[in-house]
Amino acid sequence: RFAARHAVRRQVILLLERLDCRNRRIAIAAIDIGVVEAELFQLRLQILDRAAGCTFADLRVEHMKQIADLDLDGYAIGGLAVGEPTEVMYEMISQVEPHMPKDKIRYLMGVGTPGNIIEAVARGVDLFDCVMPSRNARHGHLNTWGGIINIKNAKYERDERPIDPACGCPVCRSYSRAYIRHLFKAEEILGMRLAVMHNLWFYNHLMERIRDELDAGTFTAFHDNYVKLLDTRI
């Protein structure tokens, strides 16, 4: 069964090889004949490609080596945020990353929790996208620097503190946990809006903090302090 799945994925990789080369030729030709302005292409239509291969490390590495020769604007690792175990995702990143161009964007698709992001950065990833901060917020799950809280829980009914005392977002500066919980319990749409605003602010601040820690050479300590804490439910 393993061999059969591997063989099928191998055929997918071969097909993607041909598509990668064709798409690159089409994009370059569009610039050459003036259909697309070169400056616009570079600024707004940057080409990224994705290293495929399911959970087969050898296929992912093989495909990454192939697309690395295409000199694209960035390279993505995808297909690891749709139910795969976290340990498998980290292993695939670790296997593929050494073969990704050092001077190009490294993009992990569809990831993830704050802990996932910190672990992926530790493995060389630059860029992420995910619905998690907004989707979780709409269900009352809010990120803080001490972990994740469920604002619907009864213990927040009379809690006058902000969602996160360490957060400087407009929501934390203006509203209490008790009020936001009330909005959720009353099914007021404002509750979800405030929750989404907070979580998006938190994620943006997390990325800023990661960049600062990398610049300061203190990212390893930051990783050790927060990689598990931020995903803990409190």
Describe each region flagged by the PLM:
Residues 49-163:
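Glycine-rich phosphate/ribose-binding loops and adjacent secondary-structure elements
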Residues 19, 128, 167-170:
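Secreted/extracellular small peptides and ectodomain modules produced from precursors
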Residues 35, 88, 227-228:
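Residue-level detector of alpha-helical segments with a strong bias toward transmembrane helices
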Residues 164-234:
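C-terminal extensions of enzymes
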Residues 11-18, 94, 146, 150, ...:
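Membrane-targeting and insertion segments and their boundary/processing signals
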Residues 1-48:
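Intrinsically disordered, low-complexity segments enriched in glycine and mixed charged residues
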